[in-house]
Amino acid sequence: MAMARTKKGPLLGVVDYTLAKRAVLRDFRRGLLSRLDICDAHPELMRAARYVGEEISRGCPVCAESRLRVLAYVFADELKRDNGRVWTVDQGAALAARCRDAKCYVVEVCTGCSWNHLSEVFVGRDAV
């Protein structure tokens, strides 16, 4: 994930979803959302997180028992057969930088409790 954020040049725009994540977690801690509401990762997302996702240093904000894993889904017409595939974040950001209409969706997942949230989206700058 560091590569995508620190690389210089007109590669990617970034949409960060940290505030949305904070709002969900705040509502969970206040009792407005249940654990079932927020720990709802699809089985395919859980599988992708286990086998493709990269473990990061942050722990899960819900269960605090597992470290989060991040993975990327990249969508672009230019990608043809690779459109919508799961990638590591660095691979996904590199693909998005190569394709002008690409969007790289970065998702954080806890494989312990099924918490998942869209973390950020990298957008090819020509697509903005």
Description of each model-found segment:
Residues R35-R50, T88-A96:
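Short Cys/His-rich Zn2+-coordinating modules
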Residues D27, L36, A76-R81, V121, ...:
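Residues in flexible loops and secondary-structure boundaries
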Residues A96-V128:
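Short, compact, well-ordered microdomains
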Residues G53-C60, V106-C110:
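Residues immediately within or flanking Cys/His clusters that coordinate Zn2+
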Residues M1-H42:
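N-terminal alpha-helical interaction blocks
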Residues S57-G59, A64-R100:
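Short recognition patches in nucleic-acid-associated and regulatory proteins
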Residues G13, A49-V52:
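Generic alpha-helical structural element
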Residues K8-V15, A64-L71, R100-K103, S114-N116:
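Generic structural motif recognizing short loop/turn segments at the entrances and edges of beta-strands
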